[in-house]
Curated annotation (Swiss-Prot):
One of its GO terms (molecular function) is magnesium ion binding. This is Bifunctional glutamine synthetase adenylyltransferase/adenylyl-removing enzyme. NCBIfam families: PRK11072.1 (NF008292). Residues 1-440 are annotated as: Adenylyl removase. Signal peptide: none annotated. It comes from Escherichia coli O127:H6 (strain E2348/69 / EPEC). Belongs to the GlnE family. InterPro entries: GlnE, GlnE_rpt_dom, NT_sf, PII_UdlTrfase/GS_AdlTrfase. PANTHER family: BIFUNCTIONAL GLUTAMINE SYNTHETASE ADENYLYLTRANSFERASE_ADENYLYL-REMOVING ENZYME (PTHR30621:SF0), GLUTAMINE SYNTHETASE ADENYLYLTRANSFERASE (PTHR30621).
């Protein structure tokens, strides 16, 4: 054995001071002194358990002693009666055996291959023993999980990565996947559980037993993220679920990981063989698969970026020429040719490397250089980790640990060790570059593009830094990283398929580049990822955004400007087609062309297919809403024009809905026979409120009433004859149904018909004569106010003329000014008490004093008060033109009318923009103070003062 170097001899004196009396210096062998000097982990363990040193001296570690681990552990667990005892014994056993392995490794008593084998078998032994103990305990508690035939179902554990390959390093996480064969329920327990519940609960307990820290430490840190759907997926899957996932969604990196998958414990059972046979076609393709090279190149690029980002210099695993590159080289050949060459299907690296050389896929010299480098690097890695039982692959910077490694690796000093290490890593790097490609020579533009790809693909943590987000505040940067991470987790839950992932991987770096250039990157990204979640399973939409950069830019700008638009696009992705043509996107349909465009749109759909007709109506409306909102955001439509377009759109919809309902009713009952002597349908739809006043907003309801002029004795002329007035009632009911039916594209409009005579208690459809009689003899003043903002939005000329005449007659009735003033004011006060602002220190733009409703009440009062003298005041139903009429007819001074108009349009404009932001219609108390003061003054003048 090589004597300790000078720095280590000096350090030995420090070790001596720590040793308890049973470990007096003079009683220690040269081997013990060397090992205790090399490893703090060994020092701590032997000081805590001096009897272990006696055992090591009397029964030195052997290369094949891994064969006894299971029996030794079984003996240690023989008296364990509870989970706490299980955890304690597992931890003590692991530490005791790790001390033996570290002793053998430090003194080079066995080969490095043997060390890897022992570390892997130890982990497998501990996992299987814990599983078997817990399975028995869980069966006693819940019954035995069985399939439909009553056969007991086991928990199978796939060891992944180095554990699966039998190459575990000294301090390592263990990557596991849990599976059970068939669905069923437990039998023989106090309560019945289905197998999924049983194995999930058991799996959770198994993980806790392994990785929960106690006073005795932990056994292994358990990583379950390699399972299907990652952290968001079920903890345990049935064979059927596993097979479905890997056939439908398995990704290249999952093939890469599955190469090393090994069933822990008894791997010769029926279920183990079934699981192996099921996974083999996914891992090893029957054909030669060269596409894997690019996938591995991408993965290597991701690792290289992580090394740069985290500053992982001197990393013997992830750095250039490190352990990971040797693994990549070997697995390239396994994944490309493993389906045809059984000798390449080994889970372990060194046997596979020999097979690669035997098949002449690498030269003998290259294969030998890789073998020697691998064993050198793995010994260095394990020695490094055994110093403190610490999971690290980064070479030390302190002199003591450098001296320790140089001595244990049999070098005179640190420079000699690093010289040989550099040569080995250079050999690995050369072979890797020849096979997979060099990723070092990239232009500045490619480097920037790579950084965006890194941001998308590398699952950065919130505290990671990346130069492309340097311009954002710390909070925004963390928010962006969290949004990307959450989106990626959401993707794992969905069936996307290889093509969808490929398109997404192409799209996302471009999208992130554009979004993150904005100051509002976090907000915009939150809206867009919500949209993308809804379309990731529909590759066509992803391709649209990927193939048309202009469409992507429009999407980003619209989502940034309006969460309402983002929500609409997320709910109805068909609207994404509208992003393709900016000429139409920001140019709404001409106000007089909505009916024609809708008619043309509906021609694509069979007239007798009601479901498709309803869907088409909703899709047309949403597309037009998007175009109106886009123009609004772009500033090409002032508030008055926005409402004009929304109103014309609603009228086109009403026209089409009445047409559909009419065709359906006539097909069922025939037409009312009084129509045989006249043109038209004898039916009208009257719009009240915002629709009647040309003032619709983005989410406005439609206030409608329905009129007919059908005589009492009319009947329909179809085979199923019914009363004519009954026909119109059913027509109105059908119209309401067509508006409110919820399809995959939502409802068309919310419709409120309570403004009809007698309100909700009245008939849904009213005869023109009954409407006139009600307005003259029964209607309240507030109903006459509502009539000011009413107009026919659908109807034949005869009925329209009749309604206009009734409206004019009612509005021009002489009214006593004081009484009218009192009634209007009291109604407003009731409304304010019922609907007024419930938010302290906020101003409700519509309902509060000085808001929109006050302006509407002022105009309605003045029309009802003065139309008897000035009948021209009845001409228009919208507030802006009524204010013009009041000025023109010398009721209101022009300056006041213009000021109220400005206040009204300003407040409505704010409501539109709040709607685009999906915000409620109230603002800070100190907003719009000038407008509110003006409205209050007008209110005082017209509705309070005598």
């Amino acid at each position: 054995m090589k004597p300790l170097s000078s720095p280590l001899q000096q350090y030995w004196q420090t070790v001596v001071e720590r040793l308890p009396e049973p470990l007096a210096e003079e009683s220690l062998s040269a081997q013990a002194k060397s090992v205790l000097t090399f490893s703090d982990f060994l020092q701590d363990s032997i000081i805590a358990h001096p009897e272990w040193l006696t055992e090591l001296e009397s029964q030195p570690p052997q290369a094949d002693e891994w064969q006894h681990y299971a029996a030794w552990l079984q003996e240690a667990l023989s008296n364990v009666s509870d989970e706490a005892g299980l955890m304690r014994e597992l931890r003590l056993f692991r530490r005791r055996i790790m001390v033996r392995i570290a002793w053998a490794q430090t003194l080079a008593l066995v080969t490095e291959e043997s060390i890897l084998q022992q570390l892997s078998h130890l982990a497998e032994t501990l996992i299987v023993a814990a599983r078997d103990w817990l399975y028995d305990a869980c069966c006693r508690e819940w019954g035995t999980p069985c399939n439909a035939q009553g056969e007991a179902q086991p928990l199978l554990i796939l060891g992944m990565g180095k554990l699966g390959g039998g190459e575990l390093n000294f301090s390592s996480d263990i990557d596991l996947i849990f599976a059970w064969p068939e669905h069923g329920c437990t039998q023989g327990g106090r309560r019945e559980l289905d197998n999924a519940q049983f194995f999930t609960r058991m799996g959770q307990r198994l993980i806790k037993v392994q990785d929960q820290p106690t006073q005795d430490g932990f056994v292994y840190r358990v990583d379950m993220r390699l399972r299907p759907f990652g952290e968001s997926g079920p903890l345990v899957l049935s064979f059927a679920a596993l097979e479905d996932y890997y056939q439908e969604q398995g990704r290249d990196w999952e093939r890469y990981a599955m190469v090393k998958a090994r069933i822990m414990g008894d791997s010769d059972g029926v279920y183990a063989n079934e699981l192996r046979a099921m996974l083999r076609p996914f891992v090893f393709r029957r054909y030669i698969d060269f596409s894997v090279i690019q996938s591995l190149r991408n993965m290597k690029g991701m690792i290289a970026r992580e090394v740069r980002r985290r500053g992982l210099t001197d990393n013997i695993k992830l750095g250039a020429g490190g352990i990971r590159e040797i693994e990549f080289i070997v697995q390239v050949f396994q994944l490309i040719r493993g389906g045809r060459e059984p000798s390449l299907q080994s889970r372990s690296l060194l046997p596979t490397l020999s097979a690669i050389a035997a098949l002449h896929l690498l030269s003998e010299n290259d294969a030998e250089q890789l073998r020697v480098a691998y064993l050198f690097l793995r010994r260095l890695e394990n020695l490094l980790q055994s110093i403190n039982d610490e999971q690290t692959q980064t070479l030390p910077f302190d002199e003591l640990n450098r001296a320790r490694l140089a001595w244990a690796m049999d070098f005179a000093d640190w420079p000699q060790l690093t010289g040989v290490l550099t040569a080995h890593m250079a050999n690995v790097r050369r072979v890797f570059n020849e096979l997979i490609g060099d990723d070092e020579s990239e232009t500045q533009e490619e480097s920037l593009s790579e950084q965006w790809r890194e941001l998308w693909q590398d699952a950065l943590q919130e505290d990671d830094t990346t130069p492309v987000l340097a311009h954002l505040s710390e909070d925004d940067r963390k928010q962006v990283l969290m949004l990307i991470a959450d989106f990626r987790k959401e993707l794992d839950k969905r069936t996307i398929g290889p093509r969808g992932r490929q398109v997404l991987d192409h799209l996302m770096p471009h999208l992130l580049s554009d979004v993150c250039a904005r100051e509002d990157a976090a907000v915009t990204l939150s809206r867009i990822t919500a949209l993308l979640v809804g379309i990731v399973t529909r590759t066509t939409y992803l391709e649209l955004l990927s193939e048309f950069p202009a469409a992507l830019k429009h999407l980003i700008s619209l989502c940034a400007a309006s969460p309402m638009i983002a929500s609409q696009l997320a709910r109805y992705p068909l609207l994404l087609d509208e992003l393709l043509d900016p000429n139409t996107l920001y140019q709404p349909t001409a106000t007089d062309a909505y009916r024609d465009e809708l008619r043309q749109y509906l021609l694509r759909v069979p007239e007798d297919d009601e479901e498709q007709q309803l869907e088409a109506l909703r899709q047309f409306k949403q597309a037009q809403l998007l175009r109106i909102a886009a123009a609004d955001i772009a500033g090409t439509l002032p508030v008055m024009k926005v409402s004009d377009h929304l109103t014309w759109l609603a009228e086109a919809m009403i026209d089409a809905v009445v047409q559909q309902a009419w065709v359906q009713m006539v097909a069922r009952y025939g037409k009312p026979n009084h129509l045989n002597e006249r043109e038209g349908r004898g039916f009208a739809v009257v719009g009240y409120g915002k629709l009647g006043g040309w003032e619709l907003g983005y989410s406005s309801d439609l206030d409608l009433i329905f009129l007919h002029d059908c005589p009492m004795d009319a009947m329909t002329d179809g085979e199923r004859e019914i009363d004519g007035r009954q026909f119109y009632l059913r027509l109105a009911q059908r119209i309401m149904h067509l508006f409110s039916t919820r399809t995959s594209s939502g409802i068309l409009y919310e419709v409120d018909a309570r403004l009809r005579p007698s309100g909700a208690a009245g008939m849904l459809v009213t005869s023109a004569e009954a409407f006139a009689d009600y307005q003259k003899n029964e209607a309240w003043t507030w109903e006459h106010q509502a009539l000011v903002r009413a107009r026919v939005v659908y109807g034949d000329p005869q009925l329209t003329a009749h309604f206009d005449a009734v409206r004019r007659e009612i509005m021009t009735l002489p009214r006593e000014g004081k009484t009218l003033q009192t009634e209007v004011r009291e109604m407003r006060e009731k409304m304010r008490a019922h609907l007024g602002n419930k938010h302290r220190d906020r101003f409700d733009i519509k309902a509060d004093e000085g808001g929109i409703t006050d302006i509407e009440f002022i105009t309605q009062y003045l029309v009802l008060r003065y139309a008897h003298e000035k009948p021209k005041l009845t001409r228009w139903s919208d507030n802006v033109r009524i204010l013009e009429l009041l000025a023109q007819n010398d009721i209101m001074e022009e300056q006041e009318a213009m000021a109220l108009t400005r206040a009204y349009t300003t407040l409505r404009d704010e409501l539109h923009h709040l709607a685009l932001q999906e915000l409620p219609g109230h603002v800070s108390e100190d907003c719009f103070t000038a407008e509110r003061e003006l409205v209050r003054a007008s209110w005082q003048k017209w509705l309070v003062e005598e």
